[in-house]
């Protein structure tokens, strides 16, 4: 159930204690995932869609596909994978996004991700930041579709779960009509059938990552034309979708939509997704119900010495547009950071909401 503690002890994934990664295989067996749909997903967002964010979003929607933050293949292969990509089984379905350009290393990272129980492995070919470009990661790879195809083929050979690609419609001075179709044709020939497309070009020089999310114009019709011309491919629309309503309108003619900042800043937009998108029953009926459903998760993680702010920061926009929302944000922002902060901070923030609701009545 949403919010219930349902967690495998990550200590079993200790690489040093268990050579050959049998623990990951055990983890995979214990985190099996049912069939899932990409009709709606929440985008991978660095510093935002961590495991605590995903646990909160899962309280609001059982069906929406959730994504990890991007993890680079070197970090997964040579670092502390349990710390980096471990997750709570209650978050499923969850996809792992990888960044990299070495087919052999990406294949190994994909295998590790699959052993952890992820439902999908996604390759990042859309991030425009200078930092990832220097590692030959992200949107710069749109200029190397053959290499991306090699990466995808290697990853698909290593795992038996779907491997997908998230990309832009082009970079710099490329003609999006040519670059997108050519890129998709080359990469799909390597085996992947699913492309999540941020409907903007990426400018690799001269724009910051933030500007690259806003400045280049959106071209939703191009993505719809791609789907019409390549009906056998699964095409997911991403970029600038401001709400579920907006996404459902612009996503007509493609296979699914991916919400990014809208889902994070106003998470209640996910609360009607199961009914509207998947024809299922919504798991919570009010924002207060969502808080209470998340409370057991908060309590469990607090007992693991996780800082309250690490979790409640993802809830700041829950009451957006409601009386008392400012007080809710202020209390959580100011007091959840304090040493030893516990659930009493959450209760204080809820009490402030109640006072403002009464005053507004």
Regions found by a protein language model. Give the residues of each.
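Glycine-rich tight-turn/loop motif centered on a GG-T
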Residues: 130-147, 176-178, 206-218, 277-281
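Conserved, mostly hydrophobic/aromatic
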Residues: 42, 57, 69, 96, ...
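Alpha/beta catalytic cores of nucleotide-metabolism and tRNA/nucleoside-modifying enzymes
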Residues: 27-32, 36, 40-46, 150-153, ...
């Amino acid at each position: 159930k949403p919010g219930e503690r349902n967690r495998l002890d990550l200590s079993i994934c200790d690489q040093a204690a268990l050579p050959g990664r049998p623990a990951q295989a055990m983890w995979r067996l214990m985190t099996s995932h049912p069939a899932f749909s990409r009709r709606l997903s929440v985008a991978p967002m660095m510093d935002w869609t961590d495991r605590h964010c995903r646990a909160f979003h899962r309280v609001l929607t059982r069906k929406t596909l959730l994504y990890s933050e991007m993890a680079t293949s070197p970090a997964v292969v040579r670092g502390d994978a349990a710390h980096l990509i471990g997750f709570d089984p209650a978050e499923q379905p969850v996809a792992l996004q990888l960044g990299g350009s070495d087919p052999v290393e990406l294949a190994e990272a994909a295998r590790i991700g699959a052993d952890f129980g992820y439902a999908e492995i996604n390759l990042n070919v859309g991030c425009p930041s200078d930092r990832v470009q220097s590692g030959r990661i992200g949107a710069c790879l749109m200029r190397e579709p053959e290499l991306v195809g090699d990466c995808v083929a290697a990853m698909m050979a290593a795992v038996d779960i779907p491997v997908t690609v998230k990309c832009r419609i082009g970079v710099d001075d490329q003609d999006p009509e040519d670059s997108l179709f050519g890129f998709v044709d080359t990469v799909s020939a390597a085996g992947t059938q699913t492309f999540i497309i941020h409907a903007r070009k990426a400018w690799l020089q001269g724009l910051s990552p933030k500007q690259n999310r806003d400045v280049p114009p959106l071209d939703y019709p191009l993505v719809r034309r791609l789907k019409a011309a390549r009906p056998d491919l699964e095409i997911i629309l991403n970029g600038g979708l401001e709400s579920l309503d907006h996404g459902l309108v612009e996503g007509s003619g493609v296979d699914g939509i991916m919400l990014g900042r809208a889902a994070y800043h106003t998470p209640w937009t996910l609360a009607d997704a199961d009914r509207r998108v998947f024809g299922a029953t919504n798991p919570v009926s009010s924002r207060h119900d969502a808080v209470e459903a998340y409370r057991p998760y908060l309590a469990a993680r607090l007992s693991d010495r996780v800082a309250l702010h690490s979790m409640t920061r993802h809830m700041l926009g829950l009451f957006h547009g409601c009386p008392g929302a400012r007080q809710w944000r202020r209390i959580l922002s100011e007091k959840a950071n304090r040493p030893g902060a516990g659930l009493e901070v959450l209760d204080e923030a809820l009490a402030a909401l109640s006072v403002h609701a009464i005053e507004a009545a």
